Amino acid sequence: MKILITGRPGSGKSTMVGRLRDYLEGMGFSVGGIITPEVRVGGSRWGFEVVDIASGRRGLLASVETEGPRIGRYGVNVGVMDELAVPAIRRAMLEDDCIIIDEIGPMELKSREFRRTVDEVLSSDVLLIAAVHRKTLQSIKKREDIRVFVVDPEKRDRVYLRIIDLLGDYHGMR
């Protein structure tokens, strides 16, 4: 099963993914993959990191000072996706009960290797929980085993409970 969480910027996608990760880990499931938290400097968003959930390794994904392909005002470090994110996701495919990818969006998709790896995950039997940028969603939601949830601040808790129910019904869970 693939659970994709989408919504407007600031709607709570990453918070939802984090709550689901905590729930699964609390139930004894192993979780791997990546998160991409923002980096703030002086109260302003300066960039984004990529963090390997299993090892805690981190690297700079994008910043206002990074050279590389641009997404808005951020330069993207494609190398960190290839060297840190892709191995983290591939390892999670082999070793973990659930893969977390937060987020599948324009910055992350600048890496061809990351795109290939996401396609592999989508074609696998592994449970995936991912935050997905709205514009990216259209190209990947056509698969039968994909469940898409739209998060907004008003119905965030209701969506969380629906996903928990779905996970409880998922026959691949222990």
UniProtKB/Swiss-Prot annotation:
The superkingdom listed in its UniProt entry is Archaea
- Looking at the keywords, is Acetylation present? no
Database matches in SUPFAM superfamilies: P-loop containing nucleoside triphosphate hydrolases
Q: Where is the signal peptide?
A: none
Q: Which InterPro entries match?
A: Nuc-triphosphatase_THEP1, P-loop_NTPase
Q: Where does ATP bind?
A: 7-14, 98-105
The protein's UniProt keywords, in alphabetical order, are:
ATP-binding, Hydrolase, Nucleotide-binding
* Catalytic activity reported: a ribonucleoside 5'-triphosphate + H2O = a ribonucleoside 5'-diphosphate + phosphate + H(+)
According to its UniProt record, the EC number is: 3.6.1.15
- Keyword GTP-binding assigned: no
Q: Which Pfam families match?
A: NTPase_1
- Disulfide partners: none
Q: Which Gene3D superfamilies match?
A: P-loop containing nucleotide triphosphate hydrolases
Q: Which GO terms describe its molecular function?
A: ATP binding; ribonucleoside triphosphate phosphatase activity
User: What sort of enzyme, by top EC class, is this?
Assistant: hydrolase
Role according to the record: Has nucleotide phosphatase activity towards ATP, GTP, CTP, TTP and UTP. May hydrolyze nucleoside diphosphates with lower efficiency.
Family stated for the protein in its record: Belongs to the THEP1 NTPase family.
Q: What is this protein called?
A: Nucleoside-triphosphatase THEP1
Q: From what organism does this protein derive?
A: Methanothermobacter thermautotrophicus (strain ATCC 29096 / DSM 1053 / JCM 10044 / NBRC 100330 / Delta H) (Methanobacterium thermoautotrophicum)
